[in-house]
Structures are given as C-alpha cells and as structure tokens.
Amino acid sequence: MTSRFFYQGGDQSDTDDEPTDIDDEPSDTEPAPTDPNGKSKYLAGGNADDSDDDDGQKRVVKSAKDKRFDEMASTVDQIKNAIKINDWVSLQESFDKINKQLEKVMRVIESQKIPNLYIKALVMLEDFLAQASANKDAKKKMSPSNAKAFNSMKQKLKKNNKQYEDLIIKCRESPESEGEKDEDDEDSDEYESDDEMIEPDQLRKPEPVSDSETSELGNDRPGDDGDAPWDQKLSKKDRLLEKMFMKKPSEITWDTVNKKFKEILEARGRKGTGRFEQVEQLTFLTKVAKTPAQKLQILFSVVSAQFDVNPGLSGHMPISVWKKCVQNMLVILDILVQHPNIKVDDSVELDENETKKGDDYNGPINVWGNLVAFLEKIDAEFFKSLQCIDPHTREYVERLRDEPQFVVLAQNVQEYLESIGDFKASSKVALKRVELIYYKPHEVYEATRKLAEMTVEGDNGEMSEEPKGFEDTRIPAPFVVTLELVARKPTFPENSRTLMDVLVSLIYKYGDERTKARAMLCDIYHHALLDEFAVARDLLLMSHLQENVHHMDISTQILFNRAMSQLGLCAFRAGLVSEAHGCLSELYSGGRVKELLAQGVSQSRYHEKTPEQERLERRRQMPYHMHINLELLESVHLTSAMLLEVPNMAANVHDAKRKIISKNFRRLLEVSEKQTFTGPPETVRDHVMAATRVLINGDFQKAFDIIASLDVWKFVKNRDAVLEMLKDKIKEEALRTYLFTFSSSYDSLSVVQLTNFFDLSLPRVHSIVSRMMVNEELHASWDQPTGCIIFRNVEHSRVQALAFQLTEKLSILAESNERATEARLGGGGLDLPPRRRDGQDYAAAAAGGGSGTSSGGRWQDLSYSQTRQGSGRTGYGGGRALSFSQAGGSGGYSRGRGTGGGGYQNSGRTQGGSALRGPHGDTSTRMVSLRGVRA
C-alpha cells in the first residue's frame, strides 16, 4: 500500500502544522492527490459503475488484493476520524467492519500473516481505550448511546486482541520495523503543535517562528542542506537540540526549561505522541536543568514516561528501557544523597516554583515522587519479563543476570529510607529483597553472590542515556553535575540465612499486616529449603496464618501454598512421612496443583474459564526458575500416602471405607485395581500404585525398587540418604502390615523371626511392636524370657463386627422413633430416661434426620448452635491446619484449638450431617417447641 506521505504536491503549504477544522475533514477521508489531468487517483481505480467511465477516461484496473487493502485503509481512516471526535458508536461500527475486511484480505493474500495495518489499528484502539478509561470526567459526560458503545467496545477489543497479543507487543516495541510503515498515522496527526517528523521541504524552507518562541528558544531553524538525502527527517528531540544549542548556555533559564517541561508533560498520553520520543526529550531536559531539584523533578518524569513505553498489561517493558530506568533511579538517589535538604513526597501539594531553589538554598525543598512505588513498578516489570520470555532460551538466562542491578537499587533505596527515618516504607523495600532470596537454595545464592562480585563498573555501559558519539558531539556536560554517591554493586552476606534474618526482623517491626504475612511465609519457605523443619513448622503454627489465609489476596495465597509444599518436601527429606502427607494432602485434594502453585493454567471439564479469567491467571504465573518440581511433589505425596494407607487398610479390613487417611490415594488405587491388564509403570502414579500392590503382599524389596526407579529423586538433596530412609520406612510399614493382617493367626511370634523376615535390627523391631501395643493397635504383650510376642485374641470376627453394627443402628432407629412419637403427642407422652433426654438429644436427632423424620425442641437448637460452632473450625482449620498438626505429631495443638478435644472432631461429622438432613424431615415436627414441656 502506497502511503500519502509520498504524494505531497508542490501546492502544499508550510502551515500544515496549524490546520483548521475544515482542513481536518478532507484529510481524514483521503482526498487523494490528483494527476495532471485533474482526475482523482482513487476515483480512477473505483468500481465498474463509476460515472467517470462515460467521459472516456482511461481506467486503472486494480487487483483484488489492492482493493481489499484500500478498503481496510479507508476503514482505518474512519477509525482515526472517530477517535478525534470521541465517537464510540462509529468506532464500534468501524471495528466490526475492519474485522470483516480482515477475513477478506486473508482469503485474498492466501497467507497466515496478519497485515501490519490491522495490527497498528488495534494498537491505536487499545491506546485510545486506555486513555478514555482513565479520563473519568469525560466518561461521565458521554451520551447514553456513546457510553453503551464504549462499554461494548471495551469488551470486544479485549476479546479480539487476545489472539494478537504477540504481534501487538512487537508493534509497540518497534513500530517502524513492522514491514511497511503506516505514515497515514503521522499524516493525520499534523494538527498537533509539534510534528513527529519534519519533511525535507520544510528543512529547506525555514518556517516562520513566533516572537514568543524566538524569545524562548531562539529562532534559528535547520538551514538548507542541499547534500541531505531526499528522505531526511528530524525528530522532535533533534529539533529540541537545535533550538536549545543555538543559544548560549547562559541564556537557558529555569523558566525556559520549566516551560518546555510542562509542554512535554501536557502531550503525555495524547494521540500522536511518541512514547520513546517523549522519553528522549525528557532525558535531554535533565542535561539542561538549572537546579538539582529541577533535575530531580524531570528525572521522576523520565522514569514515569519509561513506564508508559509498554502500556499493555500482557507485555513487558523492553529490557533496554528497564535498564535505563534502573540507572535513572540510581541517579535520583545520588541527587537525594548529595542534597539532603531535598525531600521526596507524593502526598502534599507542591509550589510551582519549588524546584527553582538552587544549591544556595538551605531550607527543605519538596519534590513530587514516590521511591517505593517506582521500585515496586520496576520489580513488577522484571517479573513480567521473566514470565514472557521462553525459559528454555539463552535470553532467559541473560535476563536473570540483570537481577543484581535491581538488588543494588533496592539496597540503596532501603538505606536512603532508613537514613531519613521512614521505616514503614523501608519495610516494603525489604520485602522485595526477601522475595528475591527466599526461594534460592544455598548453591544458587552463592552463584548469585559471585555473579555480583564479578560485575565490573563498565558492564553497564549499554545503559547510558544516549549513544556515546551523540554525547560527544552535540550534548555538553550537564548544567547540574551529579556525583555517583550510592553503590553500583550489590553486597551479599556469605550466608543467605543471615540476610533473611536481618530483613524479616525489620519487616516484623515496622511492616503492615500484609507485608508481615508475606515475609513470614517467605521465612517459612526458606527455613524449609534449608531442612529446618521444626523451625518452619513452629513459625507456621505460632503465626496462625493457616486460619486467615482465605481472607488474603490471591498472590499471598499462592505464596502460602508454595510454603506448604516446600514444608512437605522438607518433612519427607527428614523422614517425617505423616507430616509430609499432612502438608501436601489438601494441595492434592482438588486436582488443581498447577493453579494453586501458579505454575500453569489448569483445565477443567466441568468449568470453562472466560478469557479474562485465564488472562488474570496467566499474569499470576511464577517465573520458571521459581517453580517447584511437580513430579517430585507428586512422588512425595503419593509415597507418603502409600506408607500411611497400606497399614491402615490392613488394620481396618472389615471397615476400610470409614477410616480413610488419603481419599485421593484410595481413589487412584481403586482405579488401578479395576484395570484388566496392568502394563509396566510409566508415570509417577503408575509407579506408586505398582509399589502399593506388591507392598500389600509383603514384598517390601520390590516395592522399594519400583519407587527408587523414579527419575525425580535426582532432584532431591542428599539423594542416597533419602532413598535409604525411604527403604527403612517401607520395611517398617511392611512389618506393621504383616502384624495387622496375620496377628489373628498367631498365639505367639518370635521377634528373631520378624527381624529375619523384614531385614530389620532387633531393637528396631522391638520399638515398632512396642509402639503398636501402646497405641492399642496390636493386642499383645511381651514375653521377655523367650523374646516372643504373646497375642491376645480380642479381634472380632466378621459376624461379630456386623452384629455390633446392626445393634448400633437398631438403637439409633428406636431412639429416633421415640423422639418422633414424643413430638407428635406434644411432649411428655413418653417418659424417657434423663440420661437419654439430656445427654443424647443430638445423637437421636441425627438418627431421626437419617430416617426421614425429625423432632422439634432442644435437638434443633442444639444442632443449630453446634453446627455454627463446628463451622468455625471445619472449613480451613479442620482441613489444612488440623491435618498438618495431626500429622506433625502436634495433636495437642489441634485439639487445644478445637472444642472438646477429640470429641470435637467426632461430633463435627455427625453435626454437619444432621444439620443438612434436618430440614428435609416432617414440617409439623420442626414447628413444635418442647422447651416449656421439658422445663
């Protein structure tokens, strides 16, 4: 597509920079240049029914491809025109139209490549939408139809742009390198006060400059340059340089710089304002700033403008811009340290002439800015860049090498905030430093420390504000010289634990609640990473985070899940199988491990996520180098469940369904047992299920071999020690399973025989059997002289167990019938024993609900109150925290926090069931109150 940029006729005036409303209208509807015969270029290529055909004019036949592109270009012009007048109804129509035209263009060109014209139109619409959304006053003034179209357009554009995210990001990063350039965009922006580019004709013909502009910046324009190439252009920054340096440095005043600074700020966010150009203009103004305060003020605006380079939420700031942003922040800190009387504040209204005060002013000077907010934004952009870059490329590793630059910036900001006494803000910076350290094992931390030590001062040369040659020839030394006073290299203690202790102590003392909670979770994670399970567990239990985590933000909940996962891995490495299972059981209860750990987007057959939900979830993803190995996590979880469930199933063979430790494991085992043919194990689940089957049969050696054949154990620290521990645990559980299964077949059993069976030492076997006796899992006693176990046959047979169950159910049924009869008779009809009336009201009510009838009076009140009491603990405390403390051997902790110790848990299940069943009973029964009768 040929742009109108190359069809400018000789009659174009030099006053195009100041168009009137009349001039704007035809420029947007493409009144094409005319040929020498006076015929319009575009009318010549019109459709076959054009009236000009009757004049005998020669027609220009266009290909279908050109026609489609011309139609799209015309629609883009309509979009630009609608943007100018803020007409969202027309924008919506044009947007639908250009999408239909895109389908036609794609069919014609027979290619999968999206036209650059369409992508630039999407970028233009996205920018205008963001600008309109930010302007709340303008939104209120919209007409109902315009507001409705605006809201509809917002949804359509978000949904449409999702499939072109990568192309939009590339277009934003390098808009001029995307094939053919869309000069129409620049041509339509000639109404702006400053052109984006200056035409060659304008270079040879100096423009008349107003007297006010002459007095400010000099009236010299670039002279005639006959040797210049035909397509030579000057950017805004070059024009600004020419204007500034035609004057003597002494003639550049604070007012001159301040006025130009305001002009640049007013153009920020305006259509047609180049973001990179604005950053360069502001960067140049820092060179000519007259006072340190003015330079600081402009530097803050430079950093803000650099943040605007990538306005989209899906992309990230270009890495080169990010590095310049870090350098600018370091220069800001240099100025603040060099001039202690300058204070940065974003909460007070500042005087316009505040930055006019120079070095000779000794009083406080206030400059708008927020160091912590800027630091957090830089950290967020670094995080987003790691999310977007492919982790399997060299680029990802190179990006990780930029981390020390952020670390040194955070160190300097924290030191400055502490020096001025702002400890609350410094605690937020300390949290950012903690979040860069907590997930790193000692080896990675040591590598980071060595990388920072090897970094030399010259490594940051590419982050200089301007190219070297440009600085040497055109920009003189800055008017305000800033010394490098803050460190440019980070410092790390030799031990990561030392640094963590210093930072979290500061946060615990001065941070807010969210900051403290996140610091605590990072601390727990780091202790678990260093195999300090007892310390990490105590921190978790004493902080009570597990009770309040549901009320925290999603990122903190993700951090909590990560901490629990690492705690489970730490417990497993330490040989604490039940504790490891307690930490990981709830994580695997819903089958959404990837989502809970923010390591991927989970897909569900029953719940389809909207594009917006999926986009939000992807923004929360953890960078690849922070991931926890999911295969290792699943191996630890299923292996722990196997070691707990196999003896449990053997001990409760007659009532296996009621006493379940891991529902997830039982479900997988049932699926595995239903398979007709079982092939060799491939996945982690297959290996654990195969090991479970052979362990139930008593073959502990084969079970260990299957588990040890998993490749994931290579990711475990001290792999050999962990596998040796795992082998001992499998032997121990095999022994327990054997005793549970065959104890009824023995009157006595020699300990020596058990040691030979299971390859365990005599003291170890003695310890295991004694523990089973103490816990009343095994009804037996020791015969010390002979070294035998004497079994007492108190196990009930199958018939006896069924008889006991029948008796219990009949008793409950009888009581429920008595309650129902009492309610129908109005109370007092049956003289129930006081013990049953007062002590067993709720148990009877539960049975009544199960039989389809329910009684009124006290049991209803009791069930309501008890259900409320139970609900306070059964939701989260009864899930994650309770299972963890039970598994961790901290039964006293969980019972102490409940009501009534172990009875609390037992009644909780019954109460919950009755509360659900009660309302489905007899309505007349529920309406009767027996409180007065019983009194």
UniProtKB/Swiss-Prot annotation:
GO CC terms, sorted: eukaryotic 43S preinitiation complex; eukaryotic 48S preinitiation complex; eukaryotic translation initiation factor 3 complex
Region (Disordered): 1-66, 135-156, 171-233, 823-935
Transmembrane stretches, start-end: none
Top-rank taxon, per record: Eukaryota
Family membership: Belongs to the eIF-3 subunit C family.
Subunit details: Component of the eukaryotic translation initiation factor 3 (eIF-3) complex.
Residue stretches of biased makeup (Polar residues): 143-154
Location in the cell: Cytoplasm
Regions of compositional bias (Gly residues) in chain numbering: 888-905
Domain (PCI): residue spans on this chain: 624-796
Function: Component of the eukaryotic translation initiation factor 3 (eIF-3) complex, which is involved in protein synthesis of a specialized repertoire of mRNAs and, together with other initiation factors, stimulates binding of mRNA and methionyl-tRNAi to the 40S ribosome. The eIF-3 complex specifically targets and initiates translation of a subset of mRNAs involved in cell proliferation.
Gene encoding the protein: TIF3C1
This protein's name: Eukaryotic translation initiation factor 3 subunit C
Entry keyword set: Cytoplasm, Initiation factor, Protein biosynthesis
InterPro entries (UniProt xref): EIF3C (IPR027516), EIF3C_N_dom (IPR008905), PCI_dom (IPR000717), WH_DNA-bd_sf (IPR036390)
Gene Ontology molecular function, alphabetical: methyltransferase activity; RNA binding; translation initiation factor activity; translation initiation factor binding
One of the GO BP terms on file: formation of cytoplasmic translation initiation complex
PROSITE patterns, alphabetized: PCI
Source lineage: Eukaryota, Viridiplantae, Streptophyta, Embryophyta, Tracheophyta
Biased composition annotated in UniProt, kind: Acidic residues: 13-28, 176-199
